[in-house]
């Protein structure tokens, strides 16, 4: 028993990134050495099954809790922060659509399958969307209807905000925390799941799958870097009328670098608050806007959801029209806010976006598995983009207010 506890302690003390890399390597080696060992595949099946089981509950309780706990005491600066977060999240999803159209990706799934229902156009997509919105909420949870889950979670959260007692809201918040902890436990076992998923793919398709996954990863990271180094600086320039890059690079260096390794916007909140203090921001403002940004500023998540969904559509041969892609951008932006700083949260929202195009939950969860395989890099870059943006937009809102009041901007911005 002591040996088992010691092994578990050593396992938990090892970086998750290192464990995933080891699991990936072990899965590939086992696939080449013993391709007929079916028991290894079961690790991947169990991992994906656990994710499939917890994901609907995760989306519902996190969205409902976030809305129920929402605050209405927001001045002009908070309004600016919310606007910037929502604007850039939508732009991130839209840019991801453009890059996916320019560089379309397909992936090798564990089970070759076709979409159960291939939508013929935007009208059919809209019909599916509206029908799924008002589906029975219990049925939506049981069947993984993420559009219905999101709709009912929003209504439940808004109603709870108005009519719920403080103790009830606390219970909802505690439930969200408990479900998030279950997700962390599952993701803590991701190395074993990744081992099984890689084993299945390599034993069936050879090592060439890593080339395809590499192209998909390159598209994801490239789109995120474009967002971080081009789009966000341009928006900051529009608000501050000065060189945005001193602020951008400082946020990437002091916030993004830490977030890259923690892989959690929520875990990076203390780092961001310390940086806000160094930037001379109002503590009453950033003490609320930074946690708010960790919830709704999800540029990287929107990019991940959009690109992975379109890759699934391309893999299944589904033709996605431009209007349907725009609809996907909106859905990805809204869904990304549900990622809420949960490790791997954006990947768990891929099925919601996939459901727009009639892609079955089984295929969508295979895409989630692919996401975990490349997540060592993807999730780190995504979190760095999101977390650095939290400080960038808090600073932009504050400094924009300074400009309106005739107060000089910090010296480092005027270089």
Please report, for each region that a protein language model flagged, where it lies by residue.
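Signature of multi-pass transmembrane helix bundles
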Residues: 8-33, 48-51, 76-247, 407-415
């Amino acid at each position: 028993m002591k040996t088992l506890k010691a092994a578990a302690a050593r396992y938990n003390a090892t970086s998750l990134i290192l464990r995933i890399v080891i699991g990936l390597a072990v899965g590939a080696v086992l696939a080449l050495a013993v391709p007929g060992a079916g028991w290894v595949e079961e690790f991947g099946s169990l991992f994906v099954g656990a994710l499939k089981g917890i994901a609907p509950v995760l989306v519902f309780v996190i969205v409902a809790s976030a809305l129920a706990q929402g605050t209405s005491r927001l001045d002009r600066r908070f309004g600016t922060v919310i606007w910037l977060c929502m604007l850039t999240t939508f732009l991130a999803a839209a840019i991801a659509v453009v890059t996916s159209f320019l560089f379309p990706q397909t992936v090798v799934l564990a089970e070759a399958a076709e979409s159960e229902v291939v939508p013929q156009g935007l009208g059919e997509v809209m019909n599916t969307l509206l029908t799924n919105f008002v589906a029975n909420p219990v049925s939506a949870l049981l069947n993984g209807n993420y559009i219905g889950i999101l709709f009912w979670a929003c209504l439940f959260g808004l109603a709870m905000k108005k009519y719920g007692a403080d103790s009830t809201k606390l219970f909802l918040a505690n439930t969200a925390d408990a479900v998030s902890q279950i997700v962390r436990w599952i993701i803590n076992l991701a190395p074993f799941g990744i081992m099984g998923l890689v084993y299945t793919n390599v034993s069936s398709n050879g090592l060439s799958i890593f080339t395809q996954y590499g192209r998909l990863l390159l598209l994801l990271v490239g789109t995120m870097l474009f967002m971080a180094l081009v789009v966000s600086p341009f928006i900051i320039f529009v608000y501050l009328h000065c060189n945005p890059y001193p602020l951008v690079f400082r946020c990437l260096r002091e916030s993004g670098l830490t977030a890259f390794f923690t892989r959690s916007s929520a875990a990076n909140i203390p780092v961001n608050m310390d940086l806000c203090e160094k930037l001379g921001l109002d503590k009453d403002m950033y003490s609320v806007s930074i946690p708010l940004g960790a919830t709704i500023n999800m540029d990287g998540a929107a990019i991940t959801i959009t690109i992975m969904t379109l890759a699934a559509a391309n893999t299944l041969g589904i033709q996605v029209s431009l209007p349907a892609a725009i609809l996907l951008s909106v859905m990805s932006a809204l869904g990304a806010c549900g990622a809420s700083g949960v490790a791997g949260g954006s990947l768990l929202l891929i099925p919601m976006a996939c459901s727009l195009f009639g892609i079955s939950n089984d295929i969508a969860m295979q895409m989630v598995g692919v996401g975990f395989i490349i997540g060592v890099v993807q999730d780190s870059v995504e979190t760095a983009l999101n977390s650095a943006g939290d400080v960038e937009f808090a600073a932009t809102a504050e400094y924009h207010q300074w400009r309106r009041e005739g107060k000089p901007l910090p010296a480092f911005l005027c270089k």
